[in-house]
Amino acid sequence: MTTLTEGPHPGGFLVWEVLRDYTRETITVASGAGKLAPGTVLGKITTGGKYTGLAPAATNGSQNAAGILWAAIDATDADAASVVILRGPAIVNRSEIILPEGATEAQINAAITALAALGIILR
């Protein structure tokens, strides 16, 4: 029998938000960010204002959590437009949020704190 594995769904991490037209925005994910899944925590690149996956060791602004990707995108070879949860009040399922592999506990806590400052609470 074949076993199927279901990946994350668009917005599947969301528990509650005050009003989708307030909490969500369409942004640009920078070329080179690769394939990103729903629930990926993003950082905002200071120069140009585009987003990429959270990169705790970076110094270009993407080391600071700035939102959570709504749906899967492929920004491997070109910029990609996508919807992101940028502000709260919103509650998301912590177990469905994607943080960078190898992130330390301190880096994870910094990301959670940054999201909380935006009104995005992880439970």
Where are these regions (language model features)?
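Surface-exposed, low-hydrophobicity beta-strand/loop segments enriched in small/polar/acidic residues
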Residues: 1-123
